[in-house]
Amino acid sequence: MARTPDLRRRQQLLDDLIDEFAAGGIGDRSLRDVAAAVGTSHRMLLHHFASRDEMLLAIVEEVERRQMAVLSKLPTDPAESFAAMWATLCRPELRPFERLFFECYSRGAQGEEPFARMVPGAVDAWLAEAAKVGGPDNDPALVRLGLAVTRGLLLDLVATDDDAGVSSAVQLFADLLRRPGWK
């Protein structure tokens, strides 16, 4: 009879894998290389994640889950919510994780598996969570625009490290959200 994976050990491996991939990207690294980097064996990774693809999806889902956790703590005003979300996401210590997200997202947009399976959820899950938090007055188009602007500015930031330029664009978008007719 097969043993149920130890969930604490799986979570610890997942945390270690996220840190490893955030530091060095995913690339085409083999399961053996990844296992060695996090101090385990490829068999243990397979035991906990079943396959390389499932391991990669678990990594993406966990990073997204961590980022979405902040939504319930945001103000309901769109401009204030955007500014607070940005203040959370733009922290320098999160940039490796943002780079990891964009690596996975771009590979998924090209149709590469398993990343292609994550792209719809990377949009739909955020929109659904924002709708729950914002309530019935949330404009779905405005929520989608906010997500697109946030991701575009994050991509700009992680690619250029131009904090000042991106911060100016963030402030401009927040100011636009404060104008009459944007809520």
Segments predicted by a language model, with ranges:
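N-terminal intrinsically disordered/low-complexity leader segments
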Residues: 1-8, 181-183
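Solvent-exposed, amphipathic alpha-helical segments
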Residues: 12, 16-23, 69-73, 100, ...
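Helix-turn-helix
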Residues: 12, 16-54, 58
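Amphipathic alpha-helical interaction segments
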Residues: 12, 54, 80-84, 99-103, ...
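Hydrophobic alpha-helical connector segments
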Residues: 58, 69-98, 142-146
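Short, basic, alpha-helical segments at the C-terminal edge of helix-turn-helix-like DNA-binding modules
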Residues: 61-67
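Amphipathic alpha-helical segments used for helix-helix packing
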Residues: 92-120
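Hydrophobic/aromatic-rich alpha-helical bundle segments in the mid-to-C-terminal region
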Residues: 112-123, 133-183
